[in-house]
């Protein structure tokens, strides 16, 4: 020992690092010319956590750990103890920097632990790195020398030298992996396997704590927690990152709980708020977590550090943003739209192939056997096969499904879960909720590696795939038939037929017409359930979108919130078999490993409808965004939606989307402004029923509330517009649907195009796309759960608006022009100018096209719904007359040549003389009206 050391430690309490000397080959060699970031642990390490005393590889190999004692704090902790010194140690490992505070006795305890570790390993050389624990510290506690009470400890002139000595001592040990990775050292340095994962953000705050049970704010949760006496304290390893915290079981390494920071975040220290000496209380909307520290100073420091971490890159989640959304607008986001399932499914398939770490999927309905690229000639693009291959590569697949009431819905989520879970252990599926409820998880989302996210109206399910051709038939190539044999007992009903010569676009249950017949026997996916030789399929029109970067992180965070909420609330998911998910930091969100081509930069904000039952918090930002966008629109609104139930009466219907449309049109009328509203709806609701007899009770119930919104009753849009402007409302608003035709069995056929889109375009600059219908179920927040995004263009291009030059957004304009092109049949109309959606010439062309098409379809097919059938009696007489398509197919074909596109007027007078509410004695009549609205 040198003289300096004797002066620093006059009582013999010095640390002699030579006692821990290792052979040269046991010292880490540090490589030069390498980026330390490339050596950090991969994100997938979060799924393979080890017990804290199992010597897991915490530090990145070859990347040095450098310690610097940057200061001291001296304080008096009591008359019997005297003055204590706290050393602030700043550590650096690659790009990670953090600070820990230690007393000198902590260095002494570490030194003795490392000595014991070296002795034990020298006695058991073959067991090196296999020992899972060192002798208990408590057993050797009486041998620990006391901290010096005087001399150098109380002398300021020795402080700098002592700091330097401790710094050199640590740095020498940290060059040797034998000590650096030992659990006593990692605990001293407050690091774990989660410390140095770049995608989790900064190092954060870590350490051993005791946490109190309870404190959850979950509906239906009954337990003893805050304000109760029957709680328990448990030892845990706490990890605090920039937007969440978690704690782990030290003995297993398993994550026991994840708490996402949100606007309810608050940190309080002290006995008054925690009911615990040296307590720290961390509040969010989901839980009040109480921790116990070893001293008041530690509690105060931890409270301060947790608050500062939350105010870092994750501070966006500590407050509500525009439209009361949990996520702020994200400028510079790459986004791409998709109309119809063909392009959307193909892009989803490409993204799945690029997945390296995680795939998140949540759907109202998911069909494992769906083909994402068609026609399929092998299983390569089948969803379940793709997910299995990625799982075999190590990708973690997490799927959330809506658990339906089986008597009401036939989507068979239980079959989907069993099928997917049997594929590979890396595929986890949870269903929610367990309790019978009137509401559903209706959102559709797929996230890859928390960096690319797809959402919109498209479930990955049967019947959704379509393209701009909207085919009514799918008979394949008669010369190359695909035999879809009925499985025999003991065979695999999901086995794929030979597809080597397949020409079908829709195999088995995928060929559908949901009004003719709802899906049945979904566990036999490749068996037809309607006769494709006699029954046309119903085309499916839908809209989706993909976003990248920080917006994708926001969507992933929503999924993680729902996943962890479900895991917390359902007992069967509390096992380690279903891991907690962790959100990646927004600080690394712009490091895109891949992109979906064809995107455009815009400002994107994630919106949602959630409630305490669905996600543990309440939000209705989708409704707020709709109302604001309509209110602030200057020139036009283009809306496609599966439902349109609005116009609040304060009792039955509560959302005010329809009211805002009325107010905006009245404002334009008063100011003499040119303003247009284009509204596209499905001609019939998507429920099984025979429309020739008036449809089923479900169809009529939805029609009742749709017509109540549009044109029937004092609260309806047209009633209020007519009262103010008479027939002039036609200059402002167009209400239409879509229809197409084809040939089957040598005869012309027609079917409506089922509009399932949930989209709004305003002024060729603003777009809303998501899963939310325009009704109370989707928009109020406290009913169905939904997702959407608000897109505001930042890149403009020249266009026209009411005959005047106009700067239109590239995203909105390209989407709107594509929609208009398909709807109006622009491929056969080469001189059609779609730039100006407001001018009189275009609006008149739109209205005339819809009227002409509707007239031709009615003359040829006597199709329903129709304005000619205002009562059930008139309906019976109407359908009793044979159509021209039946009487004279050739003449019908010649007339159909005059059809332009797919646009038809919505029949506003259909069954207007009838009450369409379900009879009280029917099962539909016994359902609360809120289910239909």
UniProtKB/Swiss-Prot annotation:
It is found in: Cell membrane. This is Phospholipase D2. GO terms for molecular function: phosphatidylinositol binding; phospholipase D activity. Function as phospholipase selective for phosphatidylcholine. May have a role in signal-induced cytoskeletal regulation and/or endocytosis. GO terms for biological process: G protein-coupled receptor internalization; intracellular signal transduction; lipid catabolic process; phosphatidic acid biosynthetic process; receptor-mediated endocytosis. CDD domains: PH_PLD. It holds the Pfam family PX. Residues 65-195 form the PX domain. Residues 441-788 are annotated as: Catalytic. InterPro entries: PH-like_dom_sf (IPR011993), PH_domain (IPR001849), PLD-like_dom (IPR025202), PLipase_D/transphosphatidylase (IPR001736), PLipase_D_euk (IPR016555), PLipase_D_fam (IPR015679), PX_dom (IPR001683), PX_dom_sf (IPR036871). It comes from Mus musculus (Mouse). The lineage of its organism: Eukaryota, Metazoa, Chordata, Craniata, Vertebrata. Residues 203-311 form the PH domain.
